[in-house]
């Protein structure tokens, strides 16, 4: 099993020592300072996959690792190393393989992956929105038969759709130029994820601080590039503190949202103590209503045992999307009760039981399935990288 986060020594010295990757176009790589005797000894004791590598060496190893069919292997290698180094992460096999495993699972190392039947998916979205406004499909088709900025009609472009980037661009054009486009979609582009790691556009826009590349048009557009998709995907995997026993849970969080695995474990503990069955989905409060959800109601039923008011419970649960939740009295008191009742320490991380839903998904898949698949790929990558010098 892989550790959940890179080991560290002095934070500032470690950044200077390990983060030596530079952006494409730089003439040369800076020489990192030599480690102290103590740091060198500590590094030597780490598992090989956790030991830092020189950025230039890692790039050449990534090029040799990537499958034959991958286009522009040096570009991939540079983007991965840049993503790690500019986010203060150690350039080592474990971190590189975590990023590559997600990229392989999500898009098989394609910067702009082809989605089968995307034109039909787009029409379904358009017609569904039109139906809500009582607009007949033939009226929509007629409206979209006009020429778009590319010279082709919107309808023809939709029929020929192959990638989410193309789909996003069409909706941008429609919203900006077609009166009905504004009526159907307002200013909200319905394409929410994309790129080589299928990152949420909303996530990228909320976590753009420190992005090392020039933003040509918008963060949305950057998500659909290889460099942007990899940078924001890396941010999604490692960009938050989480005391997980294994990276498996970070992979689950990549799919279900930050701290979903921690929150699912809390829900399991609440269910044990309260005796009330709960869906282990990682959602501690309802985001669609001010009314308490099932998790909050279950905690209410043990309010006297955790010695907290309903208001205090609610305020604690609102911290469920941050690291601070694990510092709350509610978190510690619930787990104290659960550990005591079980006679042993209960897991602080559990794979969320979430059904994956998307027009692109045609099988019965779950977050746990996704996390385990990525974890298998990461471990296979680490084993292969160990043979590449």
Predicted regions and their residues:
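Cell-wall glycan-active module
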Residues: 2-3, 9, 25-389
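Bacterial N-terminal signal peptides
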Residues: 13-24
């Amino acid at each position: 099993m892989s550790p959940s986060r890179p080991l560290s020594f002095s934070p500032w010295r470690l950044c200077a020592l390990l983060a030596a990757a530079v952006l494409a176009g730089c003439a040369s790589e800076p020489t990192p300072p030599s480690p102290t005797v103590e740091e060198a000894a500590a590094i030597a004791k780490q598992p090989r996959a956790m030991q830092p590598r020189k950025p230039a060496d890692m790039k050449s190893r990534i090029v040799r690792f990537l499958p034959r069919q991958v286009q522009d292997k040096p570009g991939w290698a540079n983007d991965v190393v840049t993503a790690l180094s500019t986010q203060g992460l150690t350039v080592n096999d474990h971190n590189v393989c975590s990023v590559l495993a997600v990229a392989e699972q999500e898009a098989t190392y394609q910067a702009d992956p082809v989605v089968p039947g995307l034109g039909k998916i787009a029409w379904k979205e358009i017609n569904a929105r039109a139906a809500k406004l009582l607009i007949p499909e033939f009226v929509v088709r007629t409206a979209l038969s006009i020429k778009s900025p590319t010279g082709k009609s919107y309808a023809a472009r939709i029929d020929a759709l192959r990638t989410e980037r193309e789909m996003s661009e069409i909706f941008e054009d429609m919203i900006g130029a077609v009166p009905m486009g504004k009526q159907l979609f307002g200013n909200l582009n319905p394409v929410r994820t994309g790129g080589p790691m299928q990152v949420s556009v909303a996530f990228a826009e909320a976590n753009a601080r420190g992005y090392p590349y020039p933003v040509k048009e918008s963060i949305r557009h950057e998500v659909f590039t290889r460099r942007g998709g990899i940078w924001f995907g890396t941010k999604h995997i490692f960009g938050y503190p989480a005391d997980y026993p294994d990276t498996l849970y970070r992979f689950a969080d990549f799919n279900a949202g930050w701290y979903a695995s921690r929150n699912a474990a809390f829900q399991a503990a609440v269910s044990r103590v309260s005796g009330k069955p709960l869906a282990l989905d990682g959602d501690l409060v309802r985001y669609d209503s001010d009314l308490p959800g099932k998790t909050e109601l279950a905690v209410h039923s043990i309010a006297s045992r955790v010695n907290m008011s309903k208001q205090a419970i609610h305020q604690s649960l609102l911290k469920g999307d941050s690291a601070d939740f694990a510092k709350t009295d509610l978190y510690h008191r619930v787990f104290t009760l659960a550990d005591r009742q079980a006679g042993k320490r209960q897991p602080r991380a559990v794979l969320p039981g979430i059904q994956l839903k998307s027009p692109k998904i045609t099988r019965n898949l779950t977050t746990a399935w996704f996390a385990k698949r990525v974890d298998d790929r990461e471990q296979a990558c680490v084993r292969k990288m160990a043979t590449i010098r």
